[in-house]
């Protein structure tokens, strides 16, 4: 997987890819339309953030590149790549339990709070995409 030079793009499978962790300066793109929704992405080396229709959807510290991000009724799936290990925050349903998979292996079940945010740490340094 490579960084998303255009900051956000639609994939042929109906998913989106976004983020460029190689940028030294913050870049953003607003009003990207996909499947009737409007997305906003901000990305650079220290942070990547995605909003959908003005609501929080994804954030990573430091910055990452995300490919094939897809929402379903059961949750979200995506692949992520970065130069360093990252803390991911994903906006999901409030007060719900999700099973989290990292590199195809279960990392266990995790709960969101009232804000619907799920926090996951992933080892990315030297790993390629996870």
Regions found by a protein language model. Give the residues of each.
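Short, isolated positions in well-ordered beta-strands
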Residues: 17, 23, 39, 57, ...
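C-terminal beta-strand-rich structural cap/linker in extracellular carbohydrate-active enzymes
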Residues: 27-50, 58-60, 86-90, 112-130
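Hydrophobic residues positioned within well-ordered beta-strands of beta-sheet architectures
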Residues: 76-78, 100, 130
């Amino acid at each position: 997987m490579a960084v998303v030079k255009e900051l956000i793009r639609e994939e042929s499978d109906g998913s989106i890819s976004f983020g460029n962790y190689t940028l030294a300066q913050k870049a953003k793109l607003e009003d990207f339309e996909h499947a009737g929704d409007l997305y906003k992405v901000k990305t650079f080396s220290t942070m990547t953030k995605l909003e959908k229709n003005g609501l929080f959807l994804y954030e990573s510290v430091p910055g990452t590149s995300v490919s094939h991000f897809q929402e379903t009724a059961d949750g979200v799936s995506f692949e992520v790549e970065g130069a360093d290990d990252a803390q991911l925050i994903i906006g999901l349903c409030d007060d719900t339990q999700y099973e989290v998979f990292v590199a195809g292996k279960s990392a266990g079940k995790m709960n969101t709070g009232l804000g619907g945010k799920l926090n996951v740490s992933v080892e990315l340094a030297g790993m390629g995409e996870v």
